[in-house]
Each structure stands twice: as structure tokens, then as C-alpha cells.
Amino acid sequence: LSGVGVVYKFLVGMTENELEHYLDLVAIGCIADIMDIHDKEVGYLVHKGLKNIRNEFFKEILKDFDLNDITPETISFNLANIINGTIRFGSMEECELLFKALIGEEEEFEYKPRKSKNNPNPQVQIETLQQHMVRIAKSVKQKQDKKKKECIKLCEKYIEENNCNDSKVLTIIDEERKLVDKRITG
């Protein structure tokens, strides 16, 4: 089990309160931590959690990505991906908003969409914290992806300049972090 699974099992043993309504958090945590869902206990928790997603932030992400088929793959490549991107690449304020969205705090934000051909004069809209955070998380993930591409180009340049193209196994040691941003590699 991952940390989220251990915490869940601990709480089940410590309280008589019903905790099944937290299984969506457990399932997504197990998937994000790349736990083996073929393990009976992990698989059970993931299956039960994905059948009943209650977290409003998770629901907003799934709605935004238009995901009707909720599987470990769709969670891993969409939901977990933008949450992880925000945690690694977001500002402290963005991470705090992410936490508030995850725990279900209620707050509203004004948002004015960009002008477009179809909507040359967009009106200010009110969005929930969860909707607001989905938009922010997607933006942060795009910035992270852009930075990742820059790092790959720097590594490719390094490989070329150091005549490493023919190496079957290649390790780049970047102690000074000139090539790869630590927010990308973890």
C-alpha cells in the first residue's frame, strides 16, 4: 500500500466512523503512486474508490477533461498528472489553493475568459474554487511541459556536443542543475 492506503487502514482501525466516502482519495493516491492494482487489497480499494468519486475537485477535473470512462489509466494520465504538476511546478499560493480545493473548501472567484472570434466580449463569470483550481492546474502543467521540452533540448545538445550519440547506455550527471530543473525530476 502507498501512504494514502496506510493512513486509510489506520483510520479504519482507529474509528467507528464510516470512512468509505474517502475511498476516492485513496484510489487516486494509490494510482498516482503507481501502486500495483493487481494486489488484492490495492485493487479492491482502487475499484471501490473509482466507483464512487465524491471529491468535488476530482469531479471538476474529470468534467473538464470530459472523462466518462474512469479507469486507472485516465486517472493517471489526466487527474494525477495535473495535480502532480501543480505540486512540483506551482507557486506556494497555487499549492495552497490546490490543497483547499482537495479538502472541499468553498470559495468563489471571478474569471473573465479570453476574447475569441466566437466570444469577442466575454463576460465575467463566477467559478468555484474547484473550477478555478482546475484552470490553474492545467496552466501550471502546460508551463511544466514547456520547461520539460526545454530540458530535453538541453540534454540533446549536451549529448551531441560531448559525442555521446553512439552510447548504448547514457547517464547525464547534472549536479549543478544546468540541464534539468529539479521541479521536473522530483
Each predicted region: which residue ranges?
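A charged, well-structured terminal subsegment
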Residues: 7-17
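Hydrophobic, small-residue-rich alpha-helical packing segments that form membrane-like cores
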Residues: 1-4
